[in-house]
């Protein structure tokens, strides 16, 4: 668990300090260029350790929104580490980026997943159920992969 930008903004809205989640105060507090920036850079464990931990817990390691956090340059390394899939269809990726990620996933035999990036009441934009769904064939591949992992675990 942690405290994120959205939680701080929620508290500021509740206290009547601002009425806008993503307005001027948000920019002052969370824009790296702002002199009033309160962001503390977190320290993370390495990608390989994360993938190993997910696999150790019986999970499927999927790289979420690869373009949003500039993860694309590391894809070949993540494949070497054993990543299982890539979030191809998501609001933060353009159609061209989605095509590139789908091609990459297929050429490296990775699962191709869709996700809404829905963060509840903290979303900046409107995302409807099904807007970024995983196509049926790719969903079946995910389901089959999950079944294979369960059988392997027994």
Name the predicted role of every residue range:
Residues 48-52, 56-60, 67-154:
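Charged catalytic cores and adjacent phosphate/nucleic-acid-binding surfaces used
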Residues 1-62:
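Conserved acidic, metal-coordinating active-site core of Asp-based
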